[in-house]
């Protein structure tokens, strides 16, 4: 019987879409296809009986109707995506964190309700998924706003969650525009093009400490170039105003406690500090040397910062001077200068590809162990085609990507699935983390897509 149901479900997934595409003139007189509010909704079975998030589930019964807009399915109390229904069978996708396993269906304006007698055995599994974006096999893409199901990107390279609205994620697309992901409405919109802000090459975005303004870094090869612009929330993040000037700046990092801003000059490799209270900037020191592209990422405590330096293939660490309210000179924390690779290891034994954006993520195991520093640092490693992380002790590990080795020996590509066994990225540059929902959002530049990793706990 179980094998029969699985086979039936597989056949249905094909037949359902064909029927939806072709249509049926007799639907109006088909009692199976239309929900009858005077009759009960019933669940007789579902298959498969177990699985993880994204499992395709078929629910069997009666009086479901065929209008998916009127059908709500919950697995383990979590809302599932309903793909289709023919009245006697619902095809849906198991959501993340459906741990409790109950299977429920609600239909119509009358909210007719049914619950399965048995539960779905949910298996926890953290995987890489695609949120939105598209590029075909020939590399053709279309940059456009719209719903997640029909939108496009140039190549997302930097992401930042709005601290006052976690459903809004702002991103730098290519180096030409600022766009926004609206998780609540599942849509993408363009906030501003570089020409509108009088920018040459967008590098990163950030929020001021209170979250009332959005900062934009501009890389322009001119002595009087606007290095950082500020856009107030009160103005809907429009009408950018220059804050500081520098030749070929890439950064606009904010100290999480004191709020001062750090920016740089790629030409000289200099790191600068800007004080909002005085409106003055000061040069701190040179990070490595000239032609040095880098970004500063502060630990949530503000005690130190990591500095990712893609051209040097290293991540440096700089302690914070609380008395003088500025970063101390940095030292190499992991990677070997000039040695590109993807080898995991500690300190200079690790090999990095091109470490770009990173974010600190609390490790609950560290909390249980009572460690002083409970954060790992996750970063997008462009040329390693992977998401990696470094521990407080300097151990570098590959978290996701470089999978599907049975396909070919090339570590890059576009594959969703298991973090290490299946998933592939292509030149990922951007990453941010929603701590509340335990979700990574990744700017997969080479695939022109936004990818996600929902930590299934």
What do these predicted regions represent?
Residues 159-161, 205-207, 252-254, 296, ...:
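Hydrophobic core register within WD40 beta-propeller blades
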Residues 1-23:
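Sec-dependent bacterial lipoprotein signal peptides
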Residues 425-457:
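Blade-level signature of beta-propeller repeat domains, shared across WD40, Kelch, NHL, RCC1
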Residues 355-395:
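Loop/turn-rich, solvent-exposed surfaces of beta-rich toroidal or solenoidal domains
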């Amino acid at each position: 019987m179980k094998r029969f149901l699985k086979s039936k479900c597989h056949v249905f997934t094909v037949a359902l879409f064909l029927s939806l595409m072709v249509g049926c003139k007799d639907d109006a007189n088909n009692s199976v296809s239309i929900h009858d509010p005077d009759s009960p909704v019933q669940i007789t079975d579902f298959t498969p009986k177990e699985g993880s998030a994204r499992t395709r589930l078929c629910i069997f019964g009666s009086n479901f109707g065929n209008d998916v807009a009127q059908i709500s399915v919950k697995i383990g109390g979590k809302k599932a995506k309903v793909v289709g229904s023919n009245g006697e069978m619902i095809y849906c996708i198991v959501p993340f964190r459906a741990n409790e396993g109950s299977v429920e269906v609600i239909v119509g304006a009358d909210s007719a309700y049914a619950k399965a007698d048995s539960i779905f055995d949910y298996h926890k599994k953290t995987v890489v998924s695609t949120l939105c974006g598209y590029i075909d096999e020939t590399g053709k893409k279309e940059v456009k706003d719209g719903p997640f199901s029909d939108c496009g990107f140039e190549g997302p390279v930097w992401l930042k969650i709005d601290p006052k609205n976690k459903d809004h994620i702002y991103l730098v697309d290519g180096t030409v525009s600022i766009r926004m992901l609206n998780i609540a409405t599942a849509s993408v919109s363009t906030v501003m093009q570089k020409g509108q802000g009088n920018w040459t090459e967008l590098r990163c975005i950030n929020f001021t400490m209170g979250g009332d303004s959005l900062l934009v870094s501009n890389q322009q090869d001119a002595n009087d170039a606007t290095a950082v612009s500020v856009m107030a929330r009160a103005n809907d993040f429009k009408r950018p105003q220059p804050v500081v000037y520098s030749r070929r700046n890439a950064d606009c990092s904010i100290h999480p406690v004191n709020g001062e801003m750090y920016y740089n000059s790629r030409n000289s490799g200099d790191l600068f500090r800007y004080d909002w209270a005085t409106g003055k900037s000061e040069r701190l020191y040179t990070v490595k040397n000239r032609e040095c592209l880098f970004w500063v990422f502060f630990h949530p405590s503000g005690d130190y910062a990591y500095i990712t330096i893609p051209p040097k293939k290293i991540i440096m660490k700089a302690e914070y001077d609380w008395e003088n309210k500025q970063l101390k000179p940095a030292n190499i924390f992991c990677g070997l200068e000039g040695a590109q690779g993807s080898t995991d290891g500690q300190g200079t034994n690790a090999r990095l590809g091109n470490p770009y954006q990173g974010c600190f993520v609390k490790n609950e195991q560290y909390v249980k162990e009572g460690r002083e520093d409970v954060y790992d640092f996750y970063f997008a490693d462009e040329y390693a085609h992977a998401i990696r992380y470094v521990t407080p002790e300097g151990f570098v590990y590959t978290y996701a990507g470089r999978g599907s080795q049975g396909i070919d020996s090339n570590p890059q590509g576009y594959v969703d699935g298991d973090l290490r066994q299946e998933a592939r990225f292509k030149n990922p540059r951007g990453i941010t983390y929603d701590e509340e929902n335990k979700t990574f959002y990744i700017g997969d530049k080479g695939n022109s897509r936004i990818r996600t990793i929902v930590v299934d706990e």
